[in-house]
């Protein structure tokens, strides 16, 4: 069984210029849910059907397009699994910001994008968002909440502020 022990490329959402993207040589992929991407020890299934294991440093949170590598140089790219999520689409950005505030106030890991936000489906949260006057679409989609929602690996993620 292949053991992936380190992260060799941490994907960031900036747009790459030129030929930087050609260094992605991983032929294998590992499809994981958001919850699975927060685990440093996990048995996984590779895209070729074989089993492998993640043995990453504690606190590692994987993102889509990250590359993990085994000690003998085998690489695999992480892909985000589609999950049952609630997505709130709105042109009313103030109302959307208020929904994000109320969701964040409940410590809901939240993906925030231009014109929409997304969280793991929860009918109680859906009801709250609908009471604010927004529509909630329950769908199957990839889910990547804002960093920090799972504590990340940086010590003191509250920048010295205490609750």
UniProtKB/Swiss-Prot annotation:
- Main location per UniProt? cytoplasm
This protein's GO CC annotations: cytoplasm
Q: Where found in the cell?
A: Cytoplasm
Q: Which UniProt keywords apply?
A: Chaperone, Cytoplasm, Nickel
Set out the biological process GO terms recorded for this chain's protein.
Answer: protein folding; protein-containing complex assembly; urea metabolic process
- List the residue ranges of the region (Disordered): 144-163
Q: Name one GO molecular function term.
A: unfolded protein binding
- Matches recorded under SMART domains: UreE_N (SM00988)
Report any Pfam family annotated for this entry.
UreE_N
Top-level division of the source organism's lineage = Bacteria
Which CDD domains does the UniProt record give? UreE
The reply to whether Chaperone figures as a keyword in the UniProt entry is yes
The family note in this entry says: Belongs to the UreE family.
Q: Which NCBIfam families match?
A: PRK13261.1-1 (NF009751)
The record's function comment reads: Involved in urease metallocenter assembly. Binds nickel. Probably functions as a nickel donor during metallocenter assembly.
Q: What is the official name of this protein in its record?
A: Urease accessory protein UreE
Native source organism of the sequence: Aliivibrio fischeri (strain MJ11) (Vibrio fischeri)
């Amino acid at each position: 069984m292949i053991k992936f022990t380190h992260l060799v490329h941490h994907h960031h959402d900036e747009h790459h210029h030129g030929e930087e993207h050609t260094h992605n040589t991983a032929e294998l992929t590992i499809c994981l849910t958001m919850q699975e991407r927060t685990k440093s020890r996990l048995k996984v299934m590779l895209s070729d059907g074989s089993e492998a294991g993640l043995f990453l440093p504690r606190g590692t949170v994987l993102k889509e397009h990250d590359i993990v590598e085994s000690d003998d140089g085998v690489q695999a790219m992480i892909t985000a699994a589609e999950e049952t999520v609630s997505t709130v689409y709105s042109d009313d950005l103030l109302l959307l910001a208020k929904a994000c505030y109320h969701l964040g106030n409940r410590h809901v890991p939240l993906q925030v994008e231009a014109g929409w936000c997304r969280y793991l489906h929860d009918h109680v949260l859906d009801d709250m968002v609908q009471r604010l006057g927004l529509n909630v679409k329950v769908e199957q989609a990839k889910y990547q909440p804002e960093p920090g929602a799972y504590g990340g690996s940086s010590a003191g993620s509250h920048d010295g502020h205490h609750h």
